[in-house]
UniProtKB/Swiss-Prot annotation:
This is Probable peptidoglycan glycosyltransferase FtsW. GO terms for cellular component: cell division site; plasma membrane. It catalyses: [GlcNAc-(1->4)-Mur2Ac(oyl-L-Ala-gamma-D-Glu-L-Lys-D-Ala-D-Ala)](n)-di-trans,octa-cis-undecaprenyl diphosphate + beta-D-GlcNAc-(1->4)-Mur2Ac(oyl-L-Ala-gamma-D-Glu-L-Lys-D-Ala-D-Ala)-di-trans,octa-cis-undecaprenyl diphosphate = [GlcNAc-(1->4)-Mur2Ac(oyl-L-Ala-gamma-D-Glu-L-Lys-D-Ala-D-Ala)](n+1)-di-trans,octa-cis-undecaprenyl diphosphate + di-trans,octa-cis-undecaprenyl diphosphate + H(+). The gene is ftsW. InterPro entries: Cell_cycle_FtsW-rel_CS, FtsW/RodA. It is a multi-pass membrane protein. Pfam families: FTSW_RODA_SPOVE. Residues 34-43, 102-113, 235-301, 362-370 are extracellular. Peptidoglycan polymerase that is essential for cell division. Belongs to the SEDS family. FtsW subfamily. Residues 1-12, 65-80, 135-157, 200-213, 323-340, 392-420 are cytoplasmic.
Length: 420
């Protein structure tokens, strides 16, 4: 039997990814051309850059797919990458604003400017590297987790060691540095992904269910508290006071249309303008200077304005199909490492689309994260494509292992007869 890896490519993951990538190029073209023309710039520059990053992502996927799985399990390599990632995040934050390589973008310090290429945002890769890192850690602790349950996850003699010792230190370091960039959106997503990975690590359901209910309850109480106090709750001495404006917009975007509520109010207008069937591709009104960041954080309202609520639902359905296919592979996986990666990547996509769309329609505060595979942004697309590359590699490995086991089973069960 031919067990060549190419025979086990999971098209139910690859095809939805390619469809979303194609829609993304079309929508980036639609949202960026008017703004580029108004600024007197090359109208095709941003869509060409996005296309280049998508082609680079396809090459990366092809390379990673061909790697043997043991290469992805190399703990020294994973540890080295995590150190480089943390140092790059710190580099972005501590360098002065005047330093050309780390000049702020929209007030945030999370970008590294590479001449001739553009900007790279390390936090976008951190979301996938956290999954990779925790999958490596938890997959080697399965016997200990089975014996000691959650006590193995939060092992330590003191409370400080339980919270910041061992595998938790790199995760906390990334969260803290990313928060003070400031980058609330990616910080929340990384934290959510880490919680998903803990839940998938093998701890008993009663612990994970209990903590999940507690966190969701606290979030609901917090959002309710925002409506009572009006959103202005972050003390001025903290480096994250910018969040107050987002909280104020969440409570009521129409009280300050010129400032804090401008984006969310115009997001509503875009969705209402689109209706069920949309105004037609390229015919959005809000992208013409009314809705800031229409090509990134708020691309989904523009999708609805141009393609309608039906078009938005179809795109979400494609994305949820992709997520479900990866989740199914993760649940069925025989290897703990494979299962953790698949559940982590599918969880990342689910959380990110919820945070993006939830912020755009006002059910949670806006956080500035991109819509997976549609928004303009090379780092975001590359980072999420890295997750898809891992998923395709692991899916092929699981399928090949299953076929090999079946082949061996039938080979050993076939009776042999001696000649009379």
């Amino acid at each position: 039997m031919n067990l060549n890896k190419n025979n086990f490519l999971n098209y139910s993951i690859l095809i939805p990814y390619l469809i979303l990538a194609g829609i993304g190029i079309v929508m980036v073209f639609s949202t960026t051309v008017p703004d580029q023309l108004q600024k007197g710039l090359n109208p095709y520059k941003l869509v060409i850059n996005q296309t280049a990053f998508e082609l680079l992502s396809l090459i990366m996927i092809a390379v990673i797919y061909r790697l043997k799985l043991r290469a992805l399990k190399n703990r020294k390599m994973i540890g080295t990458i995590m150190v480089i990632l943390i140092l790059s995040l710190i580099f972005c934050r501590i360098m002065p604003s005047s330093f050309a390589l780390t000049a702020p973008v929209n007030g945030a310090r999370g970008w590294i400017h590479i001449p001739g290429i553009g900007t790279v945002q390390p936090a976008e890769f951190a979301k996938v590297f956290i999954i990779w890192y925790l999958a490596s850690v938890f997959s080697t602790k399965q016997e200990e987790i089975e014996k000691r349950d959650i006590n193995e996850i939060f092992k330590g003699k003191t409370l400080f060691q339980k919270l910041f010792g061992g595998w938790r230190l790199p995760v906390v370091a990334i969260l803290l540095v990313d928060l003070i960039m400031p980058d609330l959106g990616n910080t929340l997503i990384i934290a959510a992904v880490a919680l998903i990975m803990i839940g998938a690590s093998g701890i008993s359901w009663r612990w994970y269910s209990g903590y999940s209910k507690l966190i969701l309850s606290l979030m609901a109480i917090f959002l309710g508290f925002l409506f009572i106090v009006g959103g202005n709750i972050i003390p001025s001495f903290l480096p994250i006071t910018y969040i107050n404006k987002r909280f104020e917009a969440f409570v009521n975007p129409f009280t300050d249309l010129a400032n804090s509520g401008h984006q969310l109010a115009n997001s509503y207008y875009a969705i209402v303008n689109g209706g069920w069937t949309g105004r037609g591709l390229g015919n959005s009104i809000q992208k013409n200077g009314f809705l800031p960041e229409a090509q990134t954080d708020f691309i989904f309202p523009i999708v609805v304005e141009e393609l309608g609520i039906i078009g938005g639902i179809i795109i979400l359905a494609i994305l949820f199909f992709l997520i479900s296919r990866m989740l199914i592979v993760g649940i069925r996986a025989k290897s703990a490492f494979n299962s953790l990666i698949m559940i982590g990547v599918s969880g990342l996509l689910l959380v990110q689309v919820f945070v993006n769309v939830g912020g755009a329609i006002g059910i949670i505060p806006e956080t500035g994260v991109t819509f997976p595979f549609l928004s303009q942004g090379g780092s975001s697309f590359l980072g999420l494509s890295l997750g898809i590359a891992f998923a395709l590699n692991i899916s092929a490995d699981e399928k090949r292992r299953e076929v090999s086991e079946l082949s061996n089973h039938y080979s050993s069960s076939v009776p042999t007869y001696e000649n009379d």
